[in-house]
Amino acid sequence: MKQEELINNEHSVRHSPPLEGLGEVFTFLGTGTSNGVPVLGCSCDVCKSKDPRDNRLRTSALLETAKTRIVIDSGPDFRQQMLPQPFRKIDGLLITHIHYDHVGGIDDVRPYCALGDIEVYANENTCNGLRHNFPYCFTDNPYPGVPKLNLHSIQPHVKFMIGDIEVMPIEVMHGGLPILGYRFGKLAYITDMKTIKDEELPYLEGIETLVVNALRWEREHHSHQLISEAIDFSRKIGAKRTYLTHLTHKIGLHEEAQKLLPNDVFFAYDGLKIHV
């Protein structure tokens, strides 16, 4: 895609033309857990792998149309994740929950504020956590140069629009912590889920593409699904294709691990783009 150089009066920034004619494009910016892959101090085959699909930054994603760009979570690898991406305005930043691996890169959205304030959406608990953890971003008189963020508290099932994309929050449980997944038409994005209440399931009817967390093959975890649980959940809601994210090095080498999954279930990897 050809890029054009434009000069902003306040900042010199590189812009990219929108994604004309491509519909919605979903990019996996990161597919790893809080440790990422490779894991510091680990010398397993996955952590030593030269296959880029085995290298996983912290979980984050990008949903784009020709007119709109939405980022889901801004973890500590956000700057590195966005460097290969065209420089476009961020129309909305959706936060799933307050844990550091999902919000640690909030400050790195600053360059995008040259293109306009960024609207940030999260549940009330996460909004309070953001104000506490990043107070300099949300004061009445912010220091010059801090990110220009407008914080919005959102509720499960209450739809809203970001540009031309309709967003519906879905509540899931991260252990004992209520967090948000998001539905965009026939696409659902859910990470860090362990369980979901039955009353949430009707809001996932008709999902064709599911992105959902799957920590590892075995050894039960108190707040994350295993791969088997993620597949069971996919079957329960009737998704046509499922991409697993928030993965540890314990899944094994991508090339080999993928062969163990059903034909309609895929291990996502950093940089993977899908059309939805």
Please state what every model-predicted region is:
Residues 11-12, 228:
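Hydrophobic residues within membrane-embedded alpha helices
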Residues 2-9, 15-190, 199, 256-276:
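Binuclear metal-dependent hydrolase catalytic cores
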Residues 195-276:
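Cap/insert and terminal regions of metallo-dependent hydrolase folds
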